[in-house]
Curated annotation (Swiss-Prot):
This is Deferrochelatase. Belongs to the DyP-type peroxidase family. Involved in the recovery of exogenous heme iron. Extracts iron from heme while preserving the protoporphyrin ring intact. Part of the iron transporter system efeUOB/M involved in iron import. Catalyzes the peroxide-mediated oxidation of Fe(2+) into Fe(3+); EfeM binds Fe(3+) and delivers it to the cell membrane permease EfeU. It comes from Bacillus subtilis (strain 168). It is found in: Secreted; Cell membrane. Heme b binds at G241, T242, G243, H326, R339.
Amino acid sequence: MSDEQKKPEQIHRRDILKWGAMAGAAVAIGASGLGGLAPLVQTAAKPSKKDEKEEEQIVPFYGKHQAGITTAHQTYVYFAALDVTAKDKSDIITLFRNWTSLTQMLTSGKKMSAEQRNQYLPPQDTGESADLSPSNLTVTFGFGPGFFEKDGKDRFGLKSKKPKHLAALPAMPNDNLDEKQGGGDICIQVCADDEQVAFHALRNLLNQAVGTCEVRFVNKGFLSGGKNGETPRNLFGFKDGTGNQSTKDDTLMNSIVWIQSGEPDWMTGGTYMAFRKIKMFLEVWDRSSLKDQEDTFGRRKSSGAPFGQKKETDPVKLNQIPSNSHVSLAKSTGKQILRRAFSYTEGLDPKTGYMDAGLLFISFQKNPDNQFIPMLKALSAKDALNEYTQTIGSALYACPGGCKKGEYIAQRLLES
């Protein structure tokens, strides 16, 4: 089908959305919590029949890299961004020391003390995951550009330590960004195979940040693979993440994800995290033909195979798929990133009455200017998928390397 033939149909789809839109007031949601007034107490794990099973669900916290990046993709995510309100770097150091202690405890399956001598103080632990396994819990921290510099002024004496590629992602033609759905001085990505375990971890981390940071946004996502480990599917029903390289290949991960040199010392073993909250127009998509859907992606919906091939993992032949398809444009750049996306649903959009759902796109790369942004520009300019999606949140974060026992996350940055 020619571009001239497609154009009226594309306008019609956009009009559907416009006709369905209604004026609505913006709703601001604030988050707050009670800080821990008593020191954190760790209890020894009691032997039980569940011990062996729980050990299999523990992702090590300490290491060269932070967990939650090349870790096997979990089912649930809570993704939060915070703005720092503290004026002194010492407060930030205290926060990251506390966060490290809590994260190490929770990811290893240990519990905070259930006993509390003073009943007139808030409980140390909110308690909702007390009887649950660690469920492959991981917590990943990152820093936004505003952590280092704000309104042209150095913050905490760390401007000289700002990573060289850390800046707000450039705005794209199809963006409709809400500043409260992107950005932030600090990000926290909490992943687990049990939603309640993930929520509990984030809730207690945010409680510890009261008085030091304000919550900017919190997103909840999910993504389930098949029974036999098949590639998960997004809300459009297509396989999501087929092009990812094996995270078990250290050489590949060093070439795509992990920073070894050329950045401030604290970024060694770290990476950059790109975040895009992408709204999907599900009602319009659901009324599109299977042919249009497959032409949009450049893959078969059922098998995930690229056009002209039989299997999902077969190589893409660019001359056999539409030039404006999502796969064609992503592959034509020759760039590689590590995708770690999740779907989200947030009820109904009060402005349109349609379902408020989409994709929490998260990717990791060692050089966003060379890897992610060229791909983003190519997709934003011509991607047929843009007819069915709109980005409403955007951010780029620098994730420090991991830490050893006795250290805390970002120590090389905060004590440099």
